[in-house]
Amino acid sequence: MKPLYDFSTLPVDRTLAPRDGMVAGDLTEQYFDLGRRALELIHFSSVLCDKPHYPEILDLPCGHGRVLRWLRAHYGYAKITACDLDRDGVDFCAQQFGALPVYSEPDLNQLHFPQQFDLIWVGSLVTHLNHDRWLTTLDCLVKWTRECGVIIFTTQGRCYTSLLARGQRNVTENIDKPALLEEFARTGFAYQKYFEAEHGDYGVAVTSPEWLQRTLQRYPDIIMRAYLEEAWGMQDVVILYKKAGHYEPALGVPEMNRVAPVPTPATRYGFIDWLLGR
């Protein structure tokens, strides 16, 4: 996609942390491009949601500042909270970019902040979580966002699953790809744990636009302002706006989706066999 805005003159601190796992080999420019792209999407959300200012910002997971450095350069006035399970990353963001450090928790229900946020950026988090943790994360994001606040998070959908189905190499090799694709075609949500994650639950999650839209119906206070396919690398971008009581709670309470995803009609037409080349 073309750049949405020109941030070429923005004074971004390009200092890289020695232990930043997102920078490898000759991928430094891609690292900065993804950070800049995130800021473009965040600025787009401010226009879309009529939010010219974001005084309180949460970057979760912040890593070593791939996106946060751009937030600091553009929103110099903002209080930016850096949160991650990687404590070295949190410490680096605090020391280098003046962020407020908060160490995350594996169970986000155990994570508490002293204030709500005007903007929450969540890049590539729910893309690694199973169904229950995915929904828990969304519950927490809504809870942590103040009235008229914005949530932006990324997902993996049709682009990512198409690459897997077509046998594209160097996308993801350490999961059960046929099982992931079959479940995705059947329900719109699928998760497979990484082969090496023997003592944890961390892997790849994929979600369809339809599944996400249905899931968001649990939240009468949340408006989906945008769903942008392939807007952050191969990941989709979702922009949500919080407004209390905007919709009638006609479809239940947040617990309604605490069950296995509902099968879709796709299986009736042999779509799974076609997708997997059988």
Which role does the model predict for each range below?
Residues 1-56, 64-112, 131-133, 152-276:
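Class I (Rossmann-like) S-adenosyl-L-methionine-dependent methyltransferase catalytic domain
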Residues 54, 117-118:
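Local beta-strand N-terminus motif with an aromatic residue
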Residues 61:
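Conserved S-adenosyl-L-methionine
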Residues 117, 147-148:
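Secondary-structure boundary elements
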Residues 121:
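A conserved beta-strand element that flanks and buttresses the S-adenosyl-L-methionine
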Residues 124-125:
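Short catalytic micro-motifs in class I SAM-dependent methyltransferases
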Residues 128:
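ABC ATPase nucleotide-binding domain "signature" loop
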Residues 135-147:
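A short glycine-rich, Lys/Arg-flanked "PGG" loop and its adjoining helix->strand segment in the class I
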